[in-house]
């Protein structure tokens, strides 16, 4: 009888504990839902951590988007610049911020799709970060310098195959997007091209204009477009979702039969992973609404960027696909950071 009594008391205790746990869970969920329904609360500011220095193209775009979101949400949206480590510093701040919708990140997807395959990060790109919305694509141009006499992409590949290693391709650095593009092209065409990694883009562009190498890959932008229009650089191909209006005769790498090499810099908004779904959905909707406005689209076009948008699920899927592709290329080419 005593054993039965103890067992019964134990069972009642367990049931009571389970009930309390369930009630606590339901209460926590209810609080989260209530908090999401009240977001944003009054004049509490939303912070966007921008992974680039103040004054650059990405910062200008982020601030223009912040102004739109502030108007639409009826609350201040402030920008905080945290450049460094290829965007990883800013994304780490976002990953470790409270998941309440008041801290967002603006960055290219590189810290999520390149950096994880090159070294250890202080955050987990999948578990700690929630993609909110794709904002824009910055096309990557494949340019011939004065040292290159190839008139089109096919001629360039023919030269590279005829003289393995003699064609030199400059990028902004080891394991940069341009470097991944180069490796994808080599794997897709069996051409052998010499990689010339720079540290950033300033000196790279100056050396391109003086013909220090044959090929340059760089993001589209007013300065680069000016040199193309002046005939100092020739566009052979572009990495972008479609042809650029300003370079309508230049094919994308996908059109040239190299879809894996058709890479561009994609930028977007991100949040801490456990941000309430209702807040993420609202942020996605408001970002898409902002990107539909003609003045913001004109601002992006003026910097040679292409507005994107789409659902958060689409954005997350694109990130996962590019990360998987980069992992394969980095392994195959044995790319390692010093």
Describe each model-derived feature in a short phrase.
Residues 23-27:
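N-terminal signal peptide c-region/cleavage motif recognized by signal peptidases
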Residues 31-128, 166, 174, 190-219, ...:
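N-terminal (or domain-start) structured segment
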Residues 35-38, 128-132, 254-260:
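Short beta-strand/turn micro-motifs at beta-sheet edges
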Residues 41-45, 229, 255, 277-338:
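An extracytoplasmic/periplasmic, membrane-proximal ligand-sensing/linker region
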Residues 137, 223-292, 324:
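C-terminal lobe and pocket-closing loops
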Residues 166-174, 178-250:
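Ligand-binding pocket segment of bilobal, Venus flytrap-like solute-binding proteins
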């Amino acid at each position: 009888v005593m054993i039965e009594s103890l067992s019964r008391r134990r069972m009642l205790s367990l049931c009571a504990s389970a009930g309390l746990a369930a009630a606590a869970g339901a209460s926590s969920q209810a609080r989260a839902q209530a908090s999401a329904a009240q977001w944003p609360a009054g004049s509490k500011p939303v912070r966007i951590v921008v992974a680039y220095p103040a004054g650059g193209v990405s910062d200008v775009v982020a601030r223009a988007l912040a102004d739109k979101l502030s108007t639409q949400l009826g609350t201040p949206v402030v920008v905080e610049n945290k450049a460094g480590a290829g965007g990883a510093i800013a994304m780490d701040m976002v990953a470790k911020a409270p998941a309440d919708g008041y801290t967002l990140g603006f960055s290219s997807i590189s810290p999520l799709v390149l950096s994880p395959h090159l070294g250890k990060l202080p955050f987990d790109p999948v578990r700690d970060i929630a993609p909110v919305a794709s904002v824009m694509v910055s096309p990557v141009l494949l340019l011939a310098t004065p040292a290159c006499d190839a008139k089109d992409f096919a001629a360039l590949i023919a030269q590279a195959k005829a003289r393995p290693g003699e064609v030199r391709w400059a990028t902004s650095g080891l394991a940069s997007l341009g470097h991944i593009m180069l490796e994808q092209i080599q794997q897709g065409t069996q051409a052998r091209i010499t990689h010339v990694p720079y540290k950033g883009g300033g000196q790279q562009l100056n050396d391109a204009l003086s013909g220090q190498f044959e090929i340059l890959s760089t993001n589209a932008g007013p300065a680069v477009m000016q040199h193309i229009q002046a005939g100092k650089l020739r566009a052979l191909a572009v990495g972008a979702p479609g042809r650029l209006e300003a370079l309508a005769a230049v094919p994308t790498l996908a059109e040239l039969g190299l879809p894996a090499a058709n890479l561009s810099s994609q930028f977007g908004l991100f949040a801490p992973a456990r941000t309430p779904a209702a807040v993420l959905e609202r942020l996605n909707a408001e970002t898409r609404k902002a990107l539909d406005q003609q003045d913001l689209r004109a601002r992006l076009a003026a910097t040679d960027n292409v507005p994107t948008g789409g659902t958060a699920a689409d954005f997350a899927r694109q990130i996962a696909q590019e990360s998987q592709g980069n992992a394969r290329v980095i392994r195959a080419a044995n790319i390692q950071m010093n």
